[in-house]
A protein has these predicted regions:
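A cross-family "folded-core" feature that marks the main globular domain of proteins
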Residues: 1-52
Length: 52
């Protein structure tokens, strides 16, 4: 059984990679922890924006 974030990573690898970079930025600049689930949701939002 695949985890939600694994499914998103497989379906949208470019968006998932981008969201991981954003997570690194948020964590380094603001000291806020971003979960894997939040990274996956961010990837979905990035995919939606790219489709517009």
């Amino acid at each position: 059984n695949l985890e939600f974030q694994e499914v998103i990573d497989r379906l949208y690898p470019k968006e998932y990679e981008c969201s991981q970079k954003i997570r690194e930025l948020i964590q380094s600049q603001y000291g806020h922890t971003v979960t894997e689930e939040e990274v996956a949701y961010l990837a979905l939002h990035i995919k939606r924006i790219r489709m517009e």
